[in-house]
């Protein structure tokens, strides 16, 4: 018993050492980030807690976004990839469990020895088997971890694409509304210029003003009229067709409709704490899961260098006569060890390649975090500046009305 306990402890220590050794050469990511954003945001709530349908509050825009998400080809492809990775992850999880199989067979063998006589040897049987690989070095455990990380990465990539599409559709929608408003203002200005031309003509014909005043009014009218075709082209090409392309409409369909009324968003948008914003970014999460998958890939490659132990348990019945088939049961246990002996460095090269893949994923993760940190800082500063500018313009408008 004491000797068995010693062997068990030694074996456990060997397994633990192998598991730790698998990733000991993997360098942890280095993130040299400032303690806080330049903007100094400390909101306890965040925009990430608000659904896009609540944030925009525009029925036409929300319908357009939803239909875009339902029809966009990239979104559909990303959803299919998520399903693919989910099923592959199920395969990796099932690999750690025993494999059950069953077989029913029958054959009849005829032998002719030296052309003297024929002998018939019928055989009927049924058997079931259970095979299981003992995960000594963590091959299957690392493979499961790798599959899970790849599945989660695909989910985060889908969420990142969804977030990008929502932002793109909303941006194009508001740009289109701005063009509509600009066109409306230009048309109103054109009508004013037409009245100015009429009055300038009357004054000139009455001798009250010189001809240059009348000609100047005509120039201003023509200049304003020239703006309308360009604005209509922008609305058609840059606005409606861009929305239709993202929406997934064919060229024969009409572009989605939108109201011309001015959109209002009440209240200040809660930005949130920088660390929370970084943690909840889908692209950051996807990069982090890709890093975890690469780390698990190192573990798989490392464990693949060691022997693999398989057990098979088979039992059944077999007889040459069907009526007596249950009189001859059988069973056996088979164990096998498969060990790499000499492969000209293939296993070591595979392990080194996995380490290089991990380094790539680590550097991409570090780069992504730095990029997102800067994007978040710039977005917060831009949002505050634009909001202050809008408030000042609204004050000027109110003062002009008064």
Region locations from a protein language model:
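Hydrophobic, lipid-facing positions within transmembrane beta-strands of outer-membrane proteins
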Residues: 124-130, 172, 273, 331-337
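Intrinsically disordered, glycine/charged-rich N-terminal periplasmic/extracytoplasmic linker segments
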Residues: 60-105, 119-122, 129, 133
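Amphipathic alpha-helical coiled-coil segments
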Residues: 77-92, 161, 167-187, 195, ...
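Periplasmic alpha-helical coiled-coil/stalk elements that build and connect Gram-negative outer-membrane
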Residues: 140, 149, 156-273, 386
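Small/polar (Gly/Ser/Thr/Ala-rich) solvent-exposed segments
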Residues: 76, 96-120, 131-160, 180, ...
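Metallo-beta-lactamase
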Residues: 231, 282, 361
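Terminal intrinsically disordered/low-complexity segments used for targeting and assembly
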Residues: 2-70, 232-279
């Amino acid at each position: 018993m004491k000797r068995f306990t010693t062997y068990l402890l030694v074996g456990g220590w060997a397994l633990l050492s192998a598991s730790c050794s698998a990733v000991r050469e993997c360098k942890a990511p280095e993130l040299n980030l400032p303690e806080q954003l330049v903007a100094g945001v400390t909101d306890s709530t965040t925009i990430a807690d608000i659904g896009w349908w609540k944030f925009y509050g525009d029925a036409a825009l929300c319908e357009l976004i939803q239909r875009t998400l339902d029809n966009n080809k990239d979104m559909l492809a990303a959803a299919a990839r998520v399903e693919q990775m989910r099923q592959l992850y199920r395969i990796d999880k099932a690999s750690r469990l025993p494999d059950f199989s069953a077989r029913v067979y029958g054959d009849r063998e005829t032998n002719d020895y030296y052309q003297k006589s024929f002998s018939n040897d019928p055989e009927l049987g049924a058997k079931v088997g259970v095979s299981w690989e003992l995960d000594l070095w963590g091959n299957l455990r690392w493979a499961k971890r790798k599959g899970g990380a790849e599945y989660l990465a695909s989910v985060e990539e889908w969420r990142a694409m969804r977030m990008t599409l929502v932002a793109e559709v909303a941006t194009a929608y508001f740009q289109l509304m701005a063009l509509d408003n600009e066109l409306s203002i230009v048309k109103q200005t054109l009508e004013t210029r037409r009245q100015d031309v009429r009055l300038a003509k009357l004054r000139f014909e009455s001798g009250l003003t010189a001809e240059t005043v009348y000609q100047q009014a005509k120039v201003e009218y023509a200049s304003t009229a020239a703006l309308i075709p360009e604005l209509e082209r922008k609305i058609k090409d840059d606005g409606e067709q861009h929305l239709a392309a993202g929406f997934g409409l064919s060229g024969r369909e009409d572009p989605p409709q939108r109201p011309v009324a001015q959109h209002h968003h009440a209240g200040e948008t809660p930005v949130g704490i920088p660390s929370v914003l970084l943690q909840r970014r889908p692209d950051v999460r996807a990069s982090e899961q890709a890093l975890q998958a690469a780390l698990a890939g190192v573990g798989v490659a490392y464990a693949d260098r060691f022997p693999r132990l398989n057990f098979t348990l088979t039992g059944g019945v077999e007889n040459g006569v069907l009526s007596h088939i249950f009189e001859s049961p059988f069973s056996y246990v088979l164990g096998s060890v498969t060990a790499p002996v000499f492969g000209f460095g293939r296993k070591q090269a595979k392990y080194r390649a996995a380490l290089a893949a991990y380094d790539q994923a680590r550097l991409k993760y570090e780069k992504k975090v730095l990029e997102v940190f800067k994007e978040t800082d710039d977005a917060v500063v831009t949002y505050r500046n634009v909001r202050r500018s809008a408030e000042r313009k609204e004050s000027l408008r109110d003062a002009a009305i008064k």
